[in-house]
Amino acid sequence: MKTLITGGTGFVGSHVCRQQMAAGHAVRLLVRDIEKASAYYRRLGEGIPELVIGDVTDSASVKTALEDCDSVVHAAAGTPMQTGSTERLFRVNVDGVKHVVASALERSIDRIVCISSITAIFNSDGAKVTATAPLTQSSLPYGQSKVEAEVYLRALQAQGAPISIVYPGGVIGPDDPGFSDSFKALKHRMENGFRIFGDGGMQYIDVRDLAAFVCSLVQSGGSGRFLMPGVYCTWSELADIIETVSGCQLQRIPAQGWKLRLVGRMTDLLRHVRTIDSPISAETMRYATLWPNIANTGELPTRGLALRSANDTFADAIAWMVEVGHLDASQCPKLSVRD
């Protein structure tokens, strides 16, 4: 089997690539910078996938990349912080999905897996967040882009297209080729104070568990929607976990949700006039203060998979951050650099 992966130099896509190669499958990545991608996989020492130059916003390069592939994982996506503009955000998250999926269907590829986001079906009532839940009509650009892509994918699914959609929560774990927003937020909390949003919480999925589930979907094919929000922790529980696994003594800051949502909106306004490298935004504050406990797909045990504990995930994530220099070792006395 040969799998095309978009976003293969991103956090999720790189782990899917590594697991597919470890299982003996051929992998091709659509990348914007071949030298950068090659250097990353060379450092891992696990083999270098086939690399082709292109971008998901360019349909011609997508069509070329899909030649002789029999499966595709679309993991390329953008966030407001990464893309820098709403226009670019929609080009990546909406046009990119359309280019990849339409081109795959034109080639009669019958194993198509798309990584979406829980935000597309977000509801502060967790019981209402299911695989059949209606789409959320977000007033925020990121949510709007994910919903627009979902409308397209669901219409194709209704016509019988072989598309599997996966909805992860916050993705965390070791070995990020870049420095994703989840890590920026974690670093900020460890160094600048950990805000406790009342009784709220968040769900985190270990990137390795998410990749394993995606690879299982590539193997099985078919069509469906699968929730993978991960392990739920209240903010107080998460602070306890971070202190337990790292030895870092966090400064815990009680915070009211409505105030944080206001700060998020103000930060977004400031981004129109200056560059702000911060995980704070209207969208992130909404999710941080209103996130419920959402059930994971029931497919995990039938596929022989189980989620890691939050302790294991954050221990490995923080150890990796120390290893690559995102955190100083003195901040995490219980952790040593991984072998």
Listing of model-derived features with the role each one plays in the protein:
Residues 45, 49-95, 103:
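NAD(P)H-binding glycine-rich loop region in Rossmannoid oxidoreductase-like domains
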Residues 81, 118-127, 171-180:
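Conserved catalytic-site region of short-chain dehydrogenase/reductase
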Residues 116, 151-174:
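Conserved beta-loop-beta element that borders a ligand/cofactor-binding pocket
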Residues 90-94, 138-150, 170, 183, ...:
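Short-chain dehydrogenase/reductase
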Residues 185-205, 209, 213:
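A conserved pocket-lining segment of Rossmann-fold NAD(P)-dependent short-chain dehydrogenase/reductase
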Residues 3-25:
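N-terminal Rossmann NAD(P)H-binding glycine-rich loop of SDR-like oxidoreductase domains
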Residues 86-87, 92-142:
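Conserved Rossmann-fold NAD(P)-dependent oxidoreductase catalytic core, especially the SDR/UDP-sugar
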Residues 213-279, 301, 308-339:
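Mid/C-terminal beta-alpha module of Rossmann-like enzyme folds, strongest
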